[in-house]
């Protein structure tokens, strides 16, 4: 059997996936753009560094020309330092006519970035620039200028700081925009998931998904709501059918009274309650007199009308807490619970018998009369089980029917108190006419 795979919580949520995707795309885009701008800037700086270095060398050659002519090393060094110190130069050397160094200048190593500047100059700048020193058109010496990587390092550090700042700003912007986008996408999906979870767990088919701001998600919500409409309708029909089947299984189709199975179950629960609370209850077994004669002489339709009227008249003499059921044929049973005394059961039985004095009107306009014979069994005096109570009430009904139809009789019990109550009620009740 295929088992449905359940979500374990180890997979990332859609919200997190979208956040990661948006942030990753933004960071990659900014990093790529920053790297491209940095490379272009470095190439541009290098393109301008070589001509600038040549201009510096030419300017130095003009400045130290007189000092080289007169061989004044001190003047050459002063002129050299004056120009080189203010330019992007790491070192400058003036050579005389014989190629011997006449004056030199080297930028002092200051700060921990000096080595990095030298390395950048070695990687990115061209070889030292050499410029001849001319006097009256004759070469009297030369100047060698070596560029510095300070500008390159400052550019790289500034570019790196700018890139980091852009990355931070981009991350914040991407997070803000992603939240808005995710709210529009994940929000409706979360609502749909919550509704689906509620429907699955609580069977609440009245839940609906609210409208989303995105067309596709809105269409999905409408389709899901339409599915819920169908499920709600199907669930309602199923509940109605189940209720109807349950009613049919426990009720008589003709009189709509509970059947024997329902009565016995209710009687069992009533006995447990009576035992726990030390209360009394009574079971009345009722049989219709002359019903077979009416059914054979007037037909089944007349017999059905008689049964329906009997059920209505019995129900009319009972309390809301009492129960009347049709056991089958023309036999009925009544459960009286709770019961103050056995005398109350006898009085209710007399009321039921008296309710049958009025004739029953049939569908053709004619009338027919019938009577009821009732047997009564009490708990706990006569029996303490459903079967025993029904049996005792049934036996009492048959004895009463043999003695006089349209009467009632209490089950046999050698209890003087119960017998005395029955005698007192019998003496106060007019004798029923023979049937």
Curated annotation (Swiss-Prot):
Phenotypic consequence of gene deletion: Static biofilms of the disruption mutant exhibit a maintenance defect, which can be further exacerbated by exposure to peroxide. The mutant biofilms produce less c-di-GMP than wild-type strain and exposure to peroxide enhances motility of surface-associated bacteria and increases cell death of the mutant. Inactivation of the gene suppresses the phenotypes observed in the tpbA mutant.
HAMP domain boundaries: 183-236
Transmembrane segments: 23-43, 155-175
Positions on the Cytoplasmic side per record topology: 1-22, 176-435
Keyword Membrane belongs to the record: yes
One Gene Ontology cellular component annotation held by this UniProt entry: plasma membrane
GGDEF domain mapped to chain residues: 279-415
A molecular function (GO) term: GTP binding
Record's bilayer topology term: Multi-pass membrane protein
One GO term of the biological process aspect: signal transduction
Annotated pathway: Purine metabolism; 3',5'-cyclic di-GMP biosynthesis
Regulation: Activity is tightly controlled by YfiR, a small periplasmic protein, and the OmpA/Pal-like outer-membrane lipoprotein YfiB. Diguanylate cyclase activity is inhibited by the specific interaction of YfiR with the TpbB periplasmic domain and is activated by YfiB, which releases the YfiR-mediated repression through sequestration of YfiR to the outer membrane. Activity is also controlled by dephosphorylation of the periplasmic domain by the tyrosine phosphatase TpbA.
Compartments it resides in: Cell inner membrane
InterPro entries: CHASE8 (IPR033417), DGC-Regulatory_Protein (IPR052163), GGDEF_dom (IPR000160), HAMP_dom (IPR003660), Nucleotide_cyclase (IPR029787), Rev_trsase/Diguanyl_cyclase (IPR043128)
Domain of life: Bacteria
Catalytic activity line of the entry: 2 GTP = 3',3'-c-di-GMP + 2 diphosphate
Periplasmic side: 44-154
EC number(s) recorded for this UniProt protein: 2.7.7.65
Residue positions binding Mg(2+): 288, 330
Catalytic residues, chain numbering: 330 (proton acceptor)
Residues covered by region (Disordered): 414-435
PANTHER family from the UniProt entry: DIGUANYLATE CYCLASE DGCT-RELATED, GGDEF DOMAIN-CONTAINING PROTEIN
Stated name of the protein: Diguanylate cyclase TpbB
Organism: Pseudomonas aeruginosa (strain UCBPP-PA14)
């Amino acid at each position: 059997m295929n088992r449905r795979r359940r979500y374990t919580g180890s997979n990332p949520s859609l919200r997190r996936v979208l956040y990661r995707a948006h942030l990753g795309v933004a960071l990659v885009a900014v990093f790529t753009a920053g790297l491209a701008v940095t490379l272009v800037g470095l190439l541009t700086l290098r393109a301008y560094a070589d001509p600038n270095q040549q201009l510096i060398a030419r300017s130095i050659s003009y400045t130290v020309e007189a000092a080289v002519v007169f061989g004044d090393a001190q003047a050459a060094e002063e002129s050299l330092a004056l120009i080189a110190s203010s330019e992007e130069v790491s070192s400058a050397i003036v050579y005389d006519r014989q190629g011997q160094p006449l004056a030199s200048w080297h930028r002092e190593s200051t700060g921990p970035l000096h080595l990095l500047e030298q390395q950048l100059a070695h990687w990115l700048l061209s070889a030292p620039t050499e410029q001849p020193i001319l006097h009256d058109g004759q070469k009297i010496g030369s100047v060698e200028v070596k560029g510095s990587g300070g500008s390159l390092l400052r550019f790289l550090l500034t570019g790196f700081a700018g890139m980091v700042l852009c990355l931070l700003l981009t991350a914040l912007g991407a997070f803000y925009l992603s939240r808005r986008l995710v709210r529009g996408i994940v929000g409706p999906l979360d609502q749909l998931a919550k509704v689906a979870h509620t429907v699955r767990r609580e069977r609440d088919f009245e839940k609906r998904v609210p409208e989303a701001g995105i067309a596709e998600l809105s269409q999905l919500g409408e389709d899901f709501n339409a599915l819920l409409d169908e499920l709600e309708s199907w669930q309602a029909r199923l509940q109605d059918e189940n209720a109807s089947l349950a009613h049919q299984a426990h009720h008589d189709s003709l009189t709509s009274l509970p059947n024997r199975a329902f009565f016995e179950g209710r009687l069992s629960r009533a006995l447990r309650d009576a035992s726990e609370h030390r209360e009394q209850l009574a079971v009345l077994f009722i049989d219709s007199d002359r019903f077979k004669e009416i059914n054979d002489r007037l037909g089944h339709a007349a017999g059905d009308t008689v049964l329906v009227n009997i059920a209505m008249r019995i129900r009319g003499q009972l309390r809301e807490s009492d129960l009347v059921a049709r056991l089958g044929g023309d036999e009925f049973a009544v459960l009286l619970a709770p019961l103050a005394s056995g005398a109350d059961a006898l009085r209710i039985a007399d009321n039921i018998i008296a309710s049958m004095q009025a004739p029953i009107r049939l569908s053709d306009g004619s009338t027919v009369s019938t009577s009821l014979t009732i047997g009564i069994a009490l708990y706990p005096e006569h029996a303490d089980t459903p079967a025993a109570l029904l049996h005792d009430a049934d036996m009492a009904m048959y004895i009463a029917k043999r003695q006089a139809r349209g009467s009632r009789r209490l089950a046999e019990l050698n209890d003087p108190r119960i017998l005395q109550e029955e005698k007192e009620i019998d003496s106060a009740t007019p004798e029923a006419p023979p049937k």
